[in-house]
Amino acid sequence: EILRCLVGSEMCIRDREKYHSYKGEVGKVAENILDRDFSTTAPMQKWTTDVSQFGFSWGKCYLSPILDMNTNEIISYDLSQSANMEQIQRMLAGAFTKFPSVDGLIFHSDQGWQYQHVYFRQALKDHKIIQSMSRKGNCYDNCIMETFFGRMKNEMFYGHEKEYSSFETFAKAVDGYINYYNNERIQEKTKWMPPTKFREASMCT
């Protein structure tokens, strides 16, 4: 699992337009509870998040998803032309509406300013979630999220940039891709099932 993760996360080294959210200690930095232990025994044990940047001739936009480390499912996501706290609020609202009871879950991220923010920390605390952060500047501590971004960009972004003539057209494509990824794209890790089907099967046993 770790080897596959590290190979897939080559994107964190070669990404042409990586978004850097680290702005120093602007809030509270959480301990690295995860410590590269990506193992799980069931869904809803460990989530991870990050923000990835997409550049076009008409501007930039930012994708902020939450990924379940057991199923690889995208739990919630928000695409915005501004990487701001409102984007994170919408992402969290989507996740907690879908899964309101996540007591004891570990939620991992990098040390981006959004995740140090009092709103983010309090939202996790209110849902009895344990916050974990990567070491500063170490993308391998969050390589599962980096792997997803790399796969997504290879499959629907690199070489296709000119197909997206506006934010609206790209947003529609992102919605379509994540729906496909969650509900149709099979993976070896999920016993050759799409992530959502794997979660549903796991939670029924």
Where in the sequence are the language-model features?
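Mobile genetic element proteins and their domesticated derivatives, centered on retroelements
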Residues: 34, 50, 66, 72, ...
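RNase H-like two-metal-ion nuclease catalytic core shared by retroviral integrases
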Residues: 21-25, 109-111, 117-119, 133-153, ...
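Short small-residue beta-strand/loop micro-motif enriched in glycine and branched aliphatics
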Residues: 73-77, 131-134, 158-160
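Charge-mixed, compositionally biased segments that are often intrinsically disordered regulatory tracts
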Residues: 14-51
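Single conserved hydrophobic/aromatic residue that forms the stacking wall/gate
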Residues: 1-8, 12-13
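An active-site-proximal beta-strand-loop segment
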Residues: 36-75, 81-85
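Active-site beta-loop-alpha junctions of metal-dependent nucleic acid enzymes
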Residues: 78-100
